[in-house]
Amino acid sequence: MSVLLVAEHINKELKPFTLNAVTAASQMDTDLHAVIIGNNCGDAAKKLSELPLVKKVIQVEATHYENFVAENFAPVIVKLAENYSHIICSANTFGKNLMPRIAASLDTSQVSDIIKVISADTFLRPIYAGHAFAPVKSKDPKKCITIRPTSFDPCESSGGSAPIEKVEPSEEFNNTKFVRREEIKSDRPELGTARIVVSGGRGMQSGDNFKLITSVADKLNAAIGASRAAVDAGYISNDHQVGQTGKVVVPDLYIAIGISGAIQHLAGMKESKVIVAINKDGEAPIFSVADYGLEADLFEAIPQFIEELNKLNTIQK
């Protein structure tokens, strides 16, 4: 049977991690279909159909799909599920809200946050805050799986021409209503998809000192991250938190400043391509995953770093 991917989008555009999810889903079966649920989402459906790995797109439209409400989306997927062996979506806020409802309705065990497809029924997922990995084999006829998108490369975004089939929507779930959306506007790259992330920890000592992190991020056109300790101390808002209970990031460059490296934080960033750590404690766990480490007082090292960055006129923004 085929694989069904639940595409994440904002009606006009596909969310970037959808391309990573397509790569993961295609490794389970080459007959990959994708469903897109929304309102006036024709443009996103067309872009989905252009992904070479997608063989068919199912488009479901209604006004009550304008905004994501898991109680409205889940019945659509459950109805389609009879034709598929695997139901896939990303292990982010979207997937963590949606997939448990689908799995419960299908009476199947969910396999969460996989980082590798070993075979069509066996997957690898992290446990113990990423310090160990467990292969999981599912014998369920219907497999509900969430994937860690940062563990898979994005697929090619053009060259495909999958047919688009429109399907009738399910009725609106009246016990849950979308109230409002609150978005934080920023000119910075999004933390979850940024090429460069500069993060600060409790070693910053205050919210005012986080201006040093901002200065470095400005020079590198980077996203700003933080450890949970920095967030709990009130130095920065929790939407910047990186780690097991925050965002998982895999940038090309991750700069950790004043972060000791608790296992919960390492779980969210240790797969970064290059890791640079700056900490005055030479025994800090962050150095165990760092490609480059500087044992120094950050309040001396970072101003010098900023000064050197100011001298470089070749940095592209």
Predicted regions mapped to residue ranges:
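N-terminal glycine-rich FAD/FM-binding segment characteristic of electron-transfer flavoproteins
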Residues: 1-317
